[in-house]
Amino acid sequence: MGETSVPAAKASDSGLVRLEGSPTGGDFVILCDHASNRVPDGFGDLGLGEADMQRHIAWDPGALPVARELARLLGAPLVYPDASRLLIDCNRPIDAPDSVSVASEDTPIPGNIELAAEVRARRVAGIYEPYHAAIDALLDGRQRAGAL
């Protein structure tokens, strides 16, 4: 399954949104909001060690391979953010208190405690908005192509 950056994501220059498969393929669109535990360059340090970043607090381990297989079986496109949900949770409303968690499960997230407004805004603009814009663009394109 080929991987590309979604055109809508390029508008923000984030490059943190991934599209795999044909945008107009199949009858479904597969989303995997918690696919990655990555903290991309430019987003600072969350104050967690590597062991914590491998835990469920940072992502849903195994979700991306399952989503890829489901997309392959259905011939559907797959869209996901290539950044940890600890930076910003793309599966929450942007104004939800837990969209940027100060703690997850039993673990404080030092890099999210007393987060400066400009840092949060950079996460929204670099991850959350491009991901949701990419989904909107994909669905709009599928509708125009008669694939929705």
State what each model feature region is.
Residues 2-148:
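N-terminal catalytic or cofactor-binding beta/alpha core of small enzyme domains
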